Amino acid sequence: LKQWELQQLFPVDRYPQLRFFLGDVRDQDRLRRALERVDTVVHAAALKQVPAAEYNPMEFVKTNVLGAENVIQACLDTGVRRVVALSTDKAAAPINLYGATKLCSDKLFIAANNIKGKRDLSFSVVRYGNVMGSRGSVIPFFLNQARKGVLPITDPAMTRFNISLQEGVAMVLWTLEHALGSELLVPKIPSYRIMDVAEAIGPGCEKPIVGIRPGEKIHEEMITASDSFSCIDLGPYYAILPSDGSGHERYDSASCSYSSVDKGFAYNSGSNPDFLSVPQLRELIKQYVDPNFAPF
């Protein structure tokens, strides 16, 4: 369906440079065919529902881990030059299987820079927070539930990072232009409290406490205190570099401007100094999710 919808938006007679493939990252031969004469790859394919991962662990391993390795091998084999893989805050100190598979994927893409040989090829990773309005996320769920007058709250203390789809795309484009390879980039973005999201969407709704789901955290991290020893500040983004020092050498050789973060620095959705207010959340929902939104 997604390929068909894209073909309607970008018909081949008007965009002859585009090709639309059905396939699966589990199928390395199909990946090689799809990547012929391709210079740039943005790897966004993943299974991502946390509870589903706990119940179907090997399916997540096949797509998120083995699929990532298939993408890497196909890029090495076909002459791709730039690869950006999308990650998640759940990959930082993961407590659920989904986060663990994405952490493994991150490590595979970063390590791929060590096996590229003399190819003009770099692999980088970008780590997002919750993409506002994405399928299966809390805001579309609350918008649907608000029509029933009830917003189930997992834990009133819960917080999450927030990024818009447009900001996420801009980060990928920045990475393609500026990244040197081997870095994991982290955006500087605000957090929200789950109770503020509930108040923004359904101030008149009931808000029963139902408990957290399997594999969930109260707060998410994008940079752990252990990461701080190899983390640098690039201005618009943080970058976690390989712990062997090769990333620092690469940035120093390229005369890039950066500063080191304090040892023990951690980037946590609960301790983030930048929180979205209820009015700000309502404006963002109108801007990025539903232009006709009004609180219930």
Regions found by a protein language model. Give the residues of each.
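Conserved Rossmann-fold cofactor-binding substructure of NAD(P)-dependent oxidoreductases
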Residues: 8, 14-40
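Hydrophobic/aromatic anchor residues within beta-strands of the central parallel beta-sheet
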Residues: 20, 60, 83, 123-126
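Strand-loop microenvironment adjacent to phosphate/nucleotide-handling motifs in alpha/beta enzyme folds
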Residues: 71, 77, 107, 111-296
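Short alpha-helix adjacent to the SAM-binding motif of class I
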Residues: 2-8
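Adenine-nucleotide cofactor-binding loop residues
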Residues: 1, 26, 48
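Conserved residues in the N-terminal Rossmann fold of short-chain dehydrogenase/reductase
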Residues: 21-22, 62, 155, 209
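Conserved Rossmann-fold NAD(P)-dependent oxidoreductase catalytic core, especially the SDR/UDP-sugar
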Residues: 43, 47-103, 107, 111
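Conserved sequence/active-site signature of Rossmann-fold short-chain dehydrogenase/reductase
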Residues: 26, 91, 131-133
